[in-house]
């Protein structure tokens, strides 16, 4: 949907996927455990862990649950053989797709990812085939209703790189991904309440989808997210309001 924030576009379906909350929590816990195992349990010194904590809180995970996950990671629990794997590919309509996975079995994971691409008319690419189109950034999102100048002044003072205001009034604040936690803390201190905060891969170009290719891309994303090994799916597909109305 052109002119709308990514919360209403590339991830717009997530709001309607409450049935998947259990699976989402499982994936977030896996990331918390892995981040704590690799970088320690102090989010101030571990940007990956801080990003995972922000994501957990954005999804209404309790502090008790996330603290237990961190403790498991620091203690070297059963997820110690998990590794991060990034797959790249081409989706319907020539879209560029990045698939971030946490897995203890590369063969299983690549088989599931390749199957999703093949079933929806896309194809799995090689390393570097589309990653050059994406930049890793921190994103802090605000719902419509805030004054643009207020958010902009606070964001720049907090050390943010950029802000984008969408047609619906939603605002995204972009930061270096390592600075996401510090910038969010500074914005929180001003009284601004974020709708969400996460590390994301931001595309430099967009691929416009039509009424035929848009449903195929959404199916690809759903198939990928149904895999227990897939943590996040990023893409550069753009769905216009007119096309979205037909879905």
Curated annotation (Swiss-Prot):
GO terms for molecular function: DNA binding. One of its GO terms (biological process) is regulation of DNA-templated transcription. One of its GO terms (cellular component) is cytosol. It is found in: Cytoplasm. Its main location: cytoplasm. InterPro entries: Integrase-like_N, TACO1_YebC-like_2nd/3rd_dom, TACO1_YebC_N, Transcrip_reg_TACO1-like, Transcrip_reg_TACO1-like_dom3, YebC-like. Keywords: Cytoplasm, DNA-binding, Transcription, Transcription regulation. NCBIfam families: PRK00110.1 (NF001030), PRK12378.1 (NF009044), YebC/PmpR family DNA-binding transcriptional regulator (TIGR01033). Belongs to the TACO1 family. This is Probable transcriptional regulatory protein YPO2055/y2255/YP_1898. The lineage of its organism: Bacteria, Pseudomonadati, Pseudomonadota, Gammaproteobacteria, Enterobacterales.
